[in-house]
From Swiss-Prot:
Self-association and partners: Homodimer.
Gene: BHLH155
Residue intervals of the bHLH domain: 544-593
Record motif Nuclear localization signal, residues: 540-547
Molecular-function GO terms, alphabetical: DNA binding; DNA-binding transcription factor activity; protein dimerization activity
Compartment(s) of residence: Nucleus
Region (Disordered): 522-558
Descriptive protein name: Transcription factor bHLH155
Length: 720
């Protein structure tokens, strides 16, 4: 974190009772996490001593050598628990922390430290503060420390922590004034300034909101706070919304996220903020909040100014407004489009401009026009009309066509005329934007795969009938009012062409098909081409490259790789060899280790037998030879130690460079070297080997002797 954390630590000791501040940072050391001293600040100006005569300065300097593991000492325990701890050494008698006081904090206590505060700052680490005087416990100061380090790591996370803390501390930042007094007349001629302020902050706030936004983001977002803060500064010098000590307007919940309200254009910052405003007691669309709904007004009057949980307030407000306002959406905005006085929404705190009101009207007109288009498209599909080039009805089969009986009454107006689509009416005019766009593909594909042939009307009709039955059971019973509007002229100022009350029947089920995303935009005109289009994604399926696998490695294979890695470390020279040679070397190594204990027992027995032979004067059979030249004489002795095939080979040489050559010769004779050593005797070297024949094979001593003579004979001839 660098110099920024140094400045934060310095701020803790500036004009306060704290004399030093230390930041312990979490770091990886091998396979474990440790706490090491990252930054420290010591206020040496408060003391008269300097340098080597300052015991507290030396104590702070010694802290840089300490390393805490997680759970070790008070610092490690605080890092694990995530809490804070106030330590007063004069009355602290916890035996579990005796090591901490006698070894780590002994120099600090001897320097006069009377209060130590240890605070966990999330994933950053731990902050430790010390004071020469006794400091009373203060939870607000602890929260202040955490907020500063959270802001240093992630400013947005610190803002969310501020919001939660404000809600917990009952610091609701709304002013305590009655809602009836918040009328637009209290702030005259300020709407233009508010609009300018919102437009200036729009681009910066949108950038911050889109880049820092996540699904778990709290409702009171920083972008809303910044806009309302700017607006509050402009409104005639009177700040209606006041900030709390936890942050800039952190206690005010400005409503729900844009996605929950259903807004499709996030660039309308002013519109979204004003739309969110009613959820905290500021109403829009009428002069008085009592005009909305008596239940909503009563709830706001009793709870808004007293409730300490802004999240509960927002949820309750959303429930009331959704249940009371949305059913009257058609009539409200139709009346709004016919009058000029009601075209702009009057807010009790901020009076919106006419442009922002028009944004509301256009957005609602677009949403209602989409619903009208979808209802008309449902009616056309239910009447059995087939578009030119469409294969929706062909794919669904004859069962879908049979549901058209008696449905043409839905298209009849009050004068008895039936509306039919014109030839020049395009598909896009009768198709709305679906939510799940590929639902039709999935339904038809399932029908085709289950039956094996999309053109089999009998099997297809059964699947469609079962699907229709399920939808009919899920659809609530009752009456519906269908507003049939011309999709070409779907403006809000035109009255609906027909309003027909119908019972819940198969036309509503057809409407359910259309509402969940069915559309007739396929360009092909036959069922064969439709089936071919469904098979195209199967052919374009990518194959994995050789050596690559999308599936995770099985656990047993991972264990095998780990064991091979351990073998490479244990077996000599096994780090760079192949797996086959590694296994071969491992087998030889294990066989050698298996015979170690057996060889040790044999060596001890042979040594005891040799001592007994020397005491009794008995000599074992031996064979000796001297290989000599002009300047060199070498003695070789081959002796049987016992009847188990153990052979003692002794040589006296003038050079010690023959040891490895002799060992290779012995191994070539299928003898196992149990023991081998050299010893210097004057100017010569004595070499001794204790060997054993493999597989109980009887080895003649002359064979061993002759093989060893071949080593010395050529060298003696060369020097001769």
């Amino acid at each position: 974190m660098g110099s920024t954390s140094q400045e934060i630590l310095k701020s803790f000791c500036f004009n306060t009772d704290w004399d030093y501040a230390v930041f312990w940072q979490l770091n990886h050391r091998g396979s474990r996490m440790v706490l090491t001293l990252e930054d420290a600040y010591y206020d040496h100006h408060g003391t008269n001593m300097h340098g080597a005569h300052d015991p507290l300065g030396l104590a702070v300097a010694k802290m840089s050598y300490h390393v805490y593991s997680l759970g070790e000492g008070i610092v490690g325990q605080v890092a694990v628990s995530g809490e804070h701890q106030w330590v007063f050494p004069e009355n602290y008698n916890n035996c579990n922390s005796a090591f901490e006081f006698h070894n780590v904090w002994e120099s600090q206590i001897s320097a006069g430290i009377k209060t130590i505060l240890v605070v966990a700052v999330g994933p950053c680490g731990v902050v430790q503060l010390g004071s020469l005087c006794k400091v009373n416990e203060d939870v607000n100061f602890v929260n202040h420390i955490r907020h500063l380090f959270l802001a240093l790591r992630d400013p947005l996370a610190d803002h969310a922590a501020n919001l939660r803390q404000c809600n917990m501390n009952n610091s609701l930042c709304l002013p305590k004034m009655p809602s009836e007094g918040l009328h637009a007349e209290a702030f005259p001629d300020c709407s233009g300034e508010v609009d300018k302020a919102m437009d200036v902050e729009e681009s910066n706030i949108l950038t911050q909101y889109k880049t820092r936004r996540s699904d778990s983001m709290p409702y009171n977002t920083p972008s809303s706070c910044l806009v309302m803060e700017k607006a509050a500064q402009v409104v005639g010098g009177r700040e209606v919304v006041q900030g709390s000590t936890c942050g800039s307007y952190s206690g005010v919940t400005f409503g729900f996220p844009v996605d929950l309200v259903g807004a499709k254009h996030e660039n309308q910052v002013g519109t979204n903020i004003i739309r969110d405003a009613p959820h905290v007691g500021m109403t829009s669309g009428c002069k008085d909040s009592r005009d909305l709904d008596p239940n909503l007004h009563l709830y706001m009057k009793n709870h808004v100014l007293n409730d300490t949980s802004t999240s509960a307030l927002a949820i309750e407000a959303e429930r009331l407004i959704t249940s009371q306002s949305y059913p009257r959406l058609d009539s409200t905005f139709q009346a709004t489009s016919r009058t000029d006085k009601e075209s702009s929404y009057h807010n009790e705190v901020f009076q919106l401009s006419e442009n922002q009101g028009n944004k509301y009207i256009k957005e609602t007109e677009r949403m209602l026009g989409r619903n009208c288009e979808s209802s008309q498209f449902d009616a056309l599909i239910s009447s059995g009309y087939t578009f030119a080039g469409s294969e929706l009805l062909e794919a669904l089969g004859s069962a879908f066509k049979q549901t058209n009986t008696g449905q043409e009454e839905l298209l009849k107006s009050e004068h008895g005329s039936t509306m039919r689509p014109t030839d020049d009416m395009s598909h896009s005019q009768l198709t709305f934007d679906p939510g799940p766009e590929n639902l039709l593909d999935a339904v038809v594909a399932n029908v085709c795969q289950r039956d094996g042939n999309a053109r089999d009307d009998m099997m297809s009709s059964r699947s469609v009938q079962s699907l229709l039955t399920n939808m009919e059971l899920a659809e609530p019973s009752g009456q519906k009012k269908h507003n049939i509007v011309n999709p070409i002229n779907s403006a809000m100022n035109q009255p609906p062409m027909a309003e027909v009350d119908t019972q819940q029947n198969s036309s509503d089920i057809c409407g359910a098909f259309s509402s969940i995303g069915f559309s007739s935009t396929y360009p092909s005109s036959s069922s064969d081409q439709f089936q071919t289009s469904l098979d195209i994604p199967k052919k374009n399926k990518k194959r994995a490259k050789p050596g690559e696998s999308s599936r995770p490695r099985p656990r047993d294979r991972q264990l095998i790789q780990d064991r091979i890695k351990e073998l490479r470390e244990l077996v000599p020279n096994g780090s760079k060899c192949s797996i086959d040679s590694l296994l071969e070397r491992t087998i030889k190594h294990m066989l050698f280790l298996q015979n170690v204990t057996k060889h040790a027992e044999k060596l001890s027995k042979s040594a005891n037998e040799k001592m007994q032979q020397k005491e009794t004067g008995m000599q074992g059979s031996s064979c000796a030879v001297e290989v000599g030249g002009h300047l060199q004489v070498s003695s070789i002795i081959v002796e049987n130690l016992n009847k188990q095939g153990m052979v003692l080979i002794e040589m006296l040489c003038e050079e010690c460079g023959h040891f490895l050559e002799i060992a290779n010769v012995i191994r070539s004779l299928d003898l196992v070297i149990l023991r081998g050593f050299t010893e210097t005797q004057g100017e010569k070297t004595w070499i001794c080997f204790v060997t054993e024949s493999q597989n109980s094979k009887v080895m003649q001593r002359m064979d061993i002797l002759w093989s060893l003579v071949q080593i010395f004979q050529p060298k003696a001839n060369e020097k001769g």
